[in-house]
C-alpha cells in the first residue's frame, strides 16, 4: 500500500485485496486531515493568511483551521515568542490531543530573529518550549515554502511509528539557563513619588535638610550653564 497516494487497485479483477498494517492505516488517514491551530504574533503570519485565498487554496490539503487546541493536531507558530507568552504557548500545546505536530515558521520563531541578540524578553527558539517537527526558515517565508513544509510534514507522518513517537515524548528536554521564568512582586504599585519622598534614612547619603539647604544655595542659572 502506498503511504501517501491511494493504493492502486487491480482494475482487471473484481475482487481486489488491500493489505496493510494498523500503523500505516492510521498514518494514511491523518495525511489529509490536519487541523492546524494558528499561533501568529508577527508579520510571518500574514504570509500564511494568503494561503486561504484561491491562488494557493490550502483547503486541498485537508487543512481546517481551528480556534480551540482541543480540536487541533497541528500548531503553527509564526512570529516572535516572548517570555511572557511562553507559559500560554506551552499550555496550548499540552491541551492538544495526541498525535500532535509543530511547525516553526520564520526566523523569529526558530532562533529569535533580530531580537535574539540583546533582548531580555525574547525566547531564542520555540523549540526550547515545545518540540518542533518541521523548521521553516525565512523572514518571512513565502506561501510556496509553507506548502513545502506541509508536504514534508505529511511525508514524516507517513513514515511514523507509534512506538517511536511515544519514546521521543518521554525524553527530558533541556532549557537554557539564561532564560528562566521567575515569579516577582509586581512593580506597578502606583506609589512611585511616595517611595522617593519617604526613603529610609539608611539608604540616603545625606539628610533631607542638608539636601534642600544645599539646593537653595546654588542658583538656577549655574545649574543650567
From Swiss-Prot:
Catalytic activity field: a plastoquinone + NADH + (n+1) H(+)(in) = a plastoquinol + NAD(+) + n H(+)(out); a plastoquinone + NADPH + (n+1) H(+)(in) = a plastoquinol + NADP(+) + n H(+)(out)
Membrane association type: Peripheral membrane protein
Protein keywords: 4Fe-4S, Chloroplast, Iron, Iron-sulfur, Membrane, Metal-binding, NAD, NADP, Plastid, Plastoquinone, Quinone, Thylakoid, Translocase, Transport
Record has Zinc as a keyword: no
Subcellular location: Plastid, Chloroplast thylakoid membrane
GO biological process assignments: aerobic respiration; electron transport coupled proton transport; photosynthesis, light reaction
Single annotated GO MF: iron ion binding
Annotated residues for binding of [4Fe-4S] cluster: 43-44, 108, 139
Main location as per UniProt: plastid
Cofactor binding summary note: Binds 1 [4Fe-4S] cluster.
EC id: 7.1.1.-
Superkingdom of the organism of origin: Eukaryota
Gene Ontology cellular component list: chloroplast thylakoid membrane; respiratory chain complex I
InterPro entries (alphabetical): NADH_UbQ_OxRdtase-like_20kDa (IPR006137), NADH_UQ_OxRdtase_20Kd_su (IPR006138)
Function: NDH shuttles electrons from NAD(P)H:plastoquinone, via FMN and iron-sulfur (Fe-S) centers, to quinones in the photosynthetic chain and possibly in a chloroplast respiratory chain. The immediate electron acceptor for the enzyme in this species is believed to be plastoquinone. Couples the redox reaction to proton translocation, and thus conserves the redox energy in a proton gradient.
Similarity comment: Belongs to the complex I 20 kDa subunit family.
Complex formation: NDH is composed of at least 16 different subunits, 5 of which are encoded in the nucleus.
Name recorded for this polypeptide: NAD(P)H-quinone oxidoreductase subunit K, chloroplastic
Organism listed in the record: Brachypodium distachyon
Amino acid at each position: 500500500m502506498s503511504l501517501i497516494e491511494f493504493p492502486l487497485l487491480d482494475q482487471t479483477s473484481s475482487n481486489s485485496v488491500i493489505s496493510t498494517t494498523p500503523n500505516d492505516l492510521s498514518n494514511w488517514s491523518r495525511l489529509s486531515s490536519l487541523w492546524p491551530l494558528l499561533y501568529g504574533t508577527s508579520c510571518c503570519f500574514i504570509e500564511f493568511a494568503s494561503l486561504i485565498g484561491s491562488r494557493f487554496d490550502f483547503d486541498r490539503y485537508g487543512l481546517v483551521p481551528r480556534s480551540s487546541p482541543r480540536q487541533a493536531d497541528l500548531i503553527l507558530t509564526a512570529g516572535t515568542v516572548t517570555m511572557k507568552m511562553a507559559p500560554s504557548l506551552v499550555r496550548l500545546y499540552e491541551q492538544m490531543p495526541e498525535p500532535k505536530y509543530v511547525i516553526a515558521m520564520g526566523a523569529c520563531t526558530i532562533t529569535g530573529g533580530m531580537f535574539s541578540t540583546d533582548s531580555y524578553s525574547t525566547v531564542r527558539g520555540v523549540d526550547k518550549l515545545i518540540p518542533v517537527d518541521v523548521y521553516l526558515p525565512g523572514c518571512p517565508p513565502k506561501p510556496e515554502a509553507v506548502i513545502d513544509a506541509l508536504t514534508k510534514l505529511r511525508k514524516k507522518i507517513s513514515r511514523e511509528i507509534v512506538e517511536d513517537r511515544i519514546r521521543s515524548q518521554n525524553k527530558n528536554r533541556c532549557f537554557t539557563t539564561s532564560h528562566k521564568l521567575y515569579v516577582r512582586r509586581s512593580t506597578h504599585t502606583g506609589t512611585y513619588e511616595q517611595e522617593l519622598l519617604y526613603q529610609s534614612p539608611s539608604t540616603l547619603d545625606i539628610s533631607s535638610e542638608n539636601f534642600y539647604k544645599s539646593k537653595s544655595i546654588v542658583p538656577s542659572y549655574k545649574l543650567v550653564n
